[in-house]
């Protein structure tokens, strides 16, 4: 499992004093209010202030003191140590842990690997790349087991639930 988890991506500058606008990669933006530090390119940085906007977060990060400096951080990921992450409820997983999981069906047939997790609102969808690309709804009727330790996700056979 990865030691660091991405919680946001710097998408723009905000103002002229080095604040950055962050697109959250977490399902609860309020978590940013509790963050004391983040890692950017492996370097620890203190969070000096946090403002929540409807779809983004504005952060003042230690060492970024001008709009020019903030511009250098566009498209950079903000990461936290796994040990500082929220504890997930049973049956919930970090996207970082699902990516590259091997997907097999209940008959043992290899489908591919999870390459992305798409948020749809009602349920997540796993993008699985193998011989072809398969979109797998992340619902209990289809996904029967997730074993993060062994990086394996088991689903019902495609012919049972997939429309041609």
Swiss-Prot record:
GO terms for molecular function: ribosome binding. GO terms for biological process: maturation of SSU-rRNA. It is found in: Cytoplasm. Its main location: cytoplasm. Residues 90-161 form the PRC barrel domain. Signal peptide: none annotated. InterPro entries: PRC_barrel-like_sf (IPR011033), PRC_RimM (IPR056792), RimM (IPR011961), RimM_N (IPR002676), RimM_N_sf (IPR036976), Transl_B-barrel_sf (IPR009000). The keyword Phosphoprotein does not apply. Keywords: Chaperone, Cytoplasm, Ribosome biogenesis, rRNA processing. It comes from the Bacteria. GO terms for cellular component: cytosol; ribosome. Disulfide bonds: none annotated. HAMAP family: Ribosome_mat_RimM. Belongs to the RimM family. Binds ribosomal protein uS19. The PRC barrel domain binds ribosomal protein uS19. An accessory protein needed during the final step in the assembly of 30S ribosomal subunit, possibly for assembly of the head region. Essential for efficient processing of 16S rRNA. May be needed both before and after RbfA during the maturation of 16S rRNA. It has affinity for free ribosomal 30S subunits but not for 70S ribosomes. This is Ribosome maturation factor RimM. The gene is rimM.
């Amino acid at each position: 499992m990865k030691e660091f988890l991405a919680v946001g991506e710097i998408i723009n500058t905000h103002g002229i004093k080095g604040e950055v606008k962050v697109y959250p990669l977490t399902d609860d933006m309020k978590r940013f209010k509790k963050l004391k530090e983040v890692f950017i390119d492996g370097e620890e940085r203190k969070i000096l202030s946090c403002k929540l906007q409807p779809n983004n977060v504005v952060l003042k990060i230690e060492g970024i003191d001008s709009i020019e400096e903030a511009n250098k951080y566009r498209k950079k990921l903000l990461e936290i140590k796994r040990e500082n992450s929220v504890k997930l409820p049973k049956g919930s997983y970090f996207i970082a842990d699902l990516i590259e999981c091997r997907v097999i069906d209940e008959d043992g047939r290899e489908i591919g690997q999870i390459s992305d997790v798409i948020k749809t609102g009602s349920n997540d969808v796993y993008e699985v790349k193998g011989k072809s690309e398969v979109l797998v709804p992340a619902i209990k009727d289809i996904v029967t087991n997730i074993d993060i330790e062994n990086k394996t996700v088991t689903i019902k056979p495609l012919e049972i639930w997939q429309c041609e």
